[in-house]
């Protein structure tokens, strides 16, 4: 019984630490990519990749998102890519954060794609039209933040006489449960 109680207390402490302390201890993990196919002009090109903010989970904690934006900008990236799941369900989750996230800066800009949560499939919408309107609003908010959404689109990043393609594809994933009305 003593071992079980110890494990239970340890589990609770770990959950509380992760929920209240660990979740705002953002860390930078640097990865160096090398390839003979990478144009020489892109040697040293810095890309910051962010994903799965699920911004609705940060309600009431704008300082943490400011801290994240400051940390990203301190990396002096050439490019920032956001790889989906900006929101949990609804575009209005961005209300307190849109201006903060607009502060992300990179020489070649901020590009994004949509994740499964961004399409709003896990929310009980009154109608399909409401869900579609939410997606339109989310795309508009990203544009207002200065983010360039690549949804089955591409752009070329140019350095000197060299270029590479940045390609964004639509999320083809399906939610585990379909909520249709």
Model-based region annotation:
Residues 1-46, 51, 55:
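Acidic, histidine-bearing metal-coordination/catalytic regions of metal-dependent phosphoesterases
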Residues 3-7, 18-22, 52-53, 83-85, ...:
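N-terminal start-of-chain detector that recognizes signal peptides
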Residues 25, 29-34, 99-171, 175:
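Extended active-site neighborhood of metal-dependent phosphoesterases/phosphodiesterases
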Residues 27, 43-133:
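Membrane-embedded segments
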Residues 37-40, 72, 158:
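Structural motif
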Residues 42, 175-176:
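Intrinsically disordered, low-complexity acidic/polar segments
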Residues 180-181:
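Conserved small/polar residues in nucleotide/adenosyl-binding loops
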């Amino acid at each position: 019984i003593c071992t079980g109680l110890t494990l239970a207390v340890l589990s609770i402490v770990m959950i509380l630490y992760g929920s209240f302390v660990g979740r705002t201890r953002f860390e930078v993990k640097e990865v160096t990519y090398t390839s003979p196919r990478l144009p020489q002009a892109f040697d040293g090109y810095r890309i910051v990749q962010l994903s799965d903010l699920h911004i609705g989970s940060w309600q009431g904690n704008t300082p943490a998102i400011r801290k994240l934006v400051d940390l990203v900008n301190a990396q002096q990236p050439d490019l920032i890519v956001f790889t989906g799941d900006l929101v949990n369900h609804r575009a209005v989750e961005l209300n307190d954060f849109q201006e903060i996230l607009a502060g992300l800066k990179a020489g070649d800009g901020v590009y994004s794609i949509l994740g499964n949560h961004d399409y709003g499939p896990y929310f009980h919408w009154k109608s399909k039209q409401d869900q579609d309107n939410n997606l339109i609003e989310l795309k508009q908010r990203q544009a207002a933040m200065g983010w360039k959404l690549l949804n089955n689109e591409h752009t070329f990043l140019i350095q000197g006489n060299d270029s590479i393609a940045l390609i964004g594809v639509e999320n083809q994933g399906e939610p585990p449960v379909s909520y249709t009305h």
